[in-house]
Amino acid sequence: MESKKQGRISIIMPVYNGVSWIGECIESIRQQTDTNWELLVLDDHSTDGTTELVFKLAEEDSRILPILRQKNGVSAARNEGLEKAQGEFIMFVDADDKLDPQMLSVLRAMLGQTESDLAVCDYYRWNGKPDGIYNRSEGLLKTDAEREENAARAKKVLRADGTEKAGAEAVSPQRAVPAEGVRVYNRSEYVSDYLLRGNTRCWSVLYRRSAIGQIRFREDLRIGEDMMFLMDLLMQISSVSITEYRGYFYRINEQGAMLKPFKPSYMDEIKSWELACRLVEKEFPSQKGRVYSILAVSGMLAAGKIARLPGAERKKYQTEVVQCHSAVQKGIAASGAKEELPKGYRIKTMLFTTCPSLYLALYHHWKN
């Protein structure tokens, strides 16, 4: 690898019709204190001016690399980005989100301190407004106080690394000690304490390219592809470092995902967890109960979305109801799964598996 590319971070950003927000996202990358990066913007032939904006920004900054492609989904775009990336490290960013200025510096420092394969930071839920940041429980945060606390989290990592400055060129191999506020997980801990605890996002992560190798996103999944990418990586990594520092702003829909109507693509959530069940049961058998309980919950969530549809429309999805029923049955039948279910789901799964039509009718009446 050329010395110029040594230590470079390749940021992969798929986009389609994102003119309203991609400028803010790209600007947050240009404001990074770590300057050794390239940004691959994979544009699925946008029709709203996104393409023109990205090319204009690329003229201003040669690190921005627009790539026009056929519209065939986020996973295919990320895979193309992986093929074309020149960096030693990889990061995925969604075009409607943004980064804290210290994010790349902090994650790079963590890889150097811990010699781990992945470095992960926490994130804010963000409504797109200057002061609209939320914690995990969706409570609005006091922006100024939180900004100071988060800067302190970043400073602990950078001071420990000795790189509290802009534009670090490469990960230093000299330390293998995590900074305060950074925890290093081995592979089993990463599965049990992180992936299977709701942390299945592929963004807010800095990956060593060598750890990814030939692993790619599954293009047959429209939901759950992030989780399966991380699951597929498991056998190629040794450790993961995770910090409390929040470096990523994840744009939220203030109406809430649960209010979105059912779409057939939601069934991919079940498919992805069925794949995960097979992998976890084989490689991490102690987590069998946990992963199968998640499969059951994913079946219940999809069934709940179908239940909220008007009666005539709901009848169109009888095949999907059967698939949900099968997933829930399979999930709760696994050893240890019932004990892992959230309490509210223990009664729900019992009713749904016993009489699906009654459950759907009751759920429809309750929610509507």
Segments (PLM) and residue ranges:
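N-proximal low-complexity "stem/linker" segments adjacent to membrane-targeting elements
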Residues: M1-S28
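Short, acidic, metal-binding catalytic loop of nucleotide-sugar glycosyltransferases
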Residues: E27-N36
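A conserved acidic beta->alpha catalytic loop
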Residues: T35, D43-E52, D94
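Glycine-rich, basic loop-to-helix element that forms the pyrophosphate-binding segment
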Residues: R69-A85
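Short aromatic/hydrophobic "clamp" motif used to bind/position activated sugar donors
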Residues: I90
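Donor-binding/catalytic cores of nucleotide-activated saccharide
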Residues: A95-S241, Y248-Y266
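Membrane-interface aromatic/basic loop that binds lipid-linked glycans or pyrophosphate carriers
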Residues: R153-K156, G162-K165, E169-S172, R308-N368
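Catalytic core of nucleotide-sugar-dependent glycosyltransferases
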Residues: S238, R246-N253, L259-Q287, S298-I332
